């Protein structure tokens, strides 16, 4: 089944790879295998923009040797695998091939040598779209563990190549925690950014100006954390979270991050005003992870019955909910709809996201809680 890939290329591997040898050639004879190659990342039958950097990938197992052929008509790239690093497709060759393949399909053939003999897997295809890609992907860069938690930053990766630069590094802010960054409609001239610890708070960047939105709004609203911009850019929905971290002595999930309380509120950017409504701000529930629909008329969020924390952390099961929003009157509807019931299913929802066209909604499902990154399930 085809799936569209416009914005995802693993930047993690970019610094490890170098271009493959131009001397590689397809095997003269190979036995056909009636299965697709098991590759990582899974780039089988995807759609790509014409400016994307080379889709470098590898076989999931360690092959004796491997070769990939990528072609469109008479144009072709042949690349030999560079050991565990995989197929390191040359940027120049790749760019020439994509330029000649806009609106067409690339055929990808993967060959693997086993016990001295070559075999060829079933070919797959990459559709080259004429649509352009946003030039940068912005993300938090941090080591995949907790030992170097005080070394992190917000970085940007140029998707047309492998250039990575820092937007802000925490060595400039006292090695505190930097997270929860967001842009309105991919506008690089505006961004919100949250920091914990020293200089903690939420900061609004607008056309070169920096405003600290909150040191502490009130005793009930200690901070603004997880954001979602309204499509108009006039509002930001925030969750306000009292977050704690603990370590397990004997559990497959080594780290537990949990909210002791959380609510959702609305920030009016133009009027510098915070607004709350009982439907999103209740002592009886933990509300978090707000996300506006693409038309701005619905706010999605996660909600769970409040529990005694940390004793009952495994009882916290977040449901996926929605509520109507009228940007003209700055009002929410009276009814909250439950789209996925975490309590009934025994699962927990986090990170809801709506596609730009409004047709799809994705979310993460885990066993409990809302910090699923540390959960092996």
Task: Pin down the residues of each PLM region.
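Conserved beta-strand position repeated across blades of beta-propeller domains
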Residues: 182-184, 228, 291, 353
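Hydrophobic beta-strand positions that form the internal "hydrophobic ladder"
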Residues: 137, 190-191, 233-236, 296-299, ...
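Multi-bladed beta-propeller domains
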Residues: 32-42, 76-93, 160-176, 205-223, ...
């Amino acid at each position: 089944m085809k799936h569209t890939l416009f914005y995802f290329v693993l930047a993690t591997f970019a610094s490890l790879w170098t271009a493959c040898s131009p001397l590689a050639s397809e095997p003269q004879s190979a036995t056909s295998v009636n299965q697709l190659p098991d590759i990582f990342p899974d780039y089988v039958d995807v759609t790509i923009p014409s400016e994307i950097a080379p889709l470098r990938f590898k076989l999931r197992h360690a092959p004796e040797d491997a070769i990939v052929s990528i072609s469109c008509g008479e144009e072709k790239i042949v690349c030999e695998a560079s050991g565990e690093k995989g197929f390191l497709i040359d940027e120049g060759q790749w760019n020439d091939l994509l330029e000649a393949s806009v609106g067409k399909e690339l055929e990808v053939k993967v060959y693997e040598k086993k016990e001295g003999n070559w075999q060829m897997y079933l070919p797959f295809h990459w559709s080259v779209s004429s649509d352009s890609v946003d030039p940068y992907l912005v993300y938090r860069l941090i080591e995949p563990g907790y030992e170097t938690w005080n070394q992190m930053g917000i970085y940007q990766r140029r998707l047309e190549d492998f250039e990575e630069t820092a937007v802000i590094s925490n060595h400039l802010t006292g090695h505190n925690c930097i997270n929860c960054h967001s842009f309105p409609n991919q506008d690089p001239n505006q961004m919100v950014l949250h920091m914990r610890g020293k200089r903690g708070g939420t900061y609004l960047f607008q056309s070169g100006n920096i405003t600290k939105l909150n040191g502490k709004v009130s005793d009930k609203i200690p901070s603004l954390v997880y954001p979602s911009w309204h499509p108009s850019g006039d509002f930001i929905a925030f969750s306000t979270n009292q977050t704690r971290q603990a370590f397990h002595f004997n559990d497959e999930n080594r780290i537990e991050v949990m909210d002791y309380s959380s609510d959702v509120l609305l920030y009016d950017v133009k009027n510098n005003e915070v607004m709350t409504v009982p439907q999103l701000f209740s002592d009886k529930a933990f509300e978090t992870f707000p996300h506006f629909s693409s038309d701005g008329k619905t706010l999605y969020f996660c909600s769970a019955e409040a529990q005694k924390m940390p004793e009952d952390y495994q009882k916290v099961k977040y449901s996926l909910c929605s509520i109507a929003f009228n940007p003209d009157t700055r009002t929410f509807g009276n009814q909250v709809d439950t789209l996925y019931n975490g309590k009934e299913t025994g699962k927990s929802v986090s990170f809801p996201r709506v596609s730009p066209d409004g047709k799809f909604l994705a979310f993460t499902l885990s066993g409990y809680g809302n910090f699923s990154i540390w959960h092996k399930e």
